[in-house]
Amino acid sequence: MELYLDTANVAEVERLARIFPIAGVTTNPSIVAASKESIWDVLPRLQNAIGEEGTLFAQTMSRDAKGMVEEAKRLNNAIPGIVVKIPVTAEGLAAIKLLKKEGIVTLGTAVYSASQGLLAALAGAKYVAPYVNRVDAQGGDGIRMVLELQTLLEHHAPDSMVLAASFKTPRQALDCLLAGCQAITLPLDVAQQMLNTPAVESAIEKFEQDWKNAFGNLNL
């Protein structure tokens, strides 16, 4: 599987990359805007943080296919091998088809239904990103949608993969993996929740106390 961090915070990527076996970093316009850095400044820094083998994702801003393709080429020139995120609209699907012919790897983003995700995959997107928590927030069932999308891709677009996004809890991420997702991207707060387990700290403290009581120190 592929595990990504959903952030443009370079310092946090460097910190968590030492801990998590991350495959790379995903960004979107809101995430980049929150960083207060120009996208052309922050992307090289993120790539440096994840190393040459890490995969970086960045999104286009244009609403029409021509503009999306032009921006995708610009992103690819700046960071060779970058995966370009394209919103799965009618124009986005047209752009994904064109970029497939150009050899630029894409991710279909802002996916709220299994049918929408399937169309992105059939158009040529390597990755499809369903918004799990946002679907839940609208009264839907994000995990069920992911399961349906995963099944559709396995049957009809096996060269594409689900990269599930938009999580509020580690449980949502785990449920996506149980549904068969090959890739997920975690916001920093959810990644941190996975690390912060009070019961683990309590167990370690008990081990230390028992050892110290027996041997007078904490050395092996």
Swiss-Prot record:
Transmembrane segments: none annotated. Its EC number is 4.1.2.-. Pfam families: TAL_FSA (PF00923). Homodecamer. It is an enzyme of class 4 (lyase). The gene is fsa. The lineage of its organism: Bacteria, Pseudomonadati, Pseudomonadota, Gammaproteobacteria, Enterobacterales. It catalyses: beta-D-fructose 6-phosphate = dihydroxyacetone + D-glyceraldehyde 3-phosphate. Keywords: Carbohydrate metabolism, Cytoplasm, Lyase, Schiff base. This is Fructose-6-phosphate aldolase. Its main location: cytoplasm. InterPro entries: Aldolase_TIM, F6P_aldolase, TAL/FSA, Transaldolase_3B/F6P_aldolase, Transaldolase_AS, TSA/FSA_arc/bac. It comes from the Bacteria. One of its GO terms (biological process) is fructose metabolic process. The active site is at residue 85. SUPFAM superfamilies: Aldolase (SSF51569). Catalyzes the reversible formation of fructose 6-phosphate from dihydroxyacetone and D-glyceraldehyde 3-phosphate via an aldolization reaction. Belongs to the transaldolase family. Type 3A subfamily.
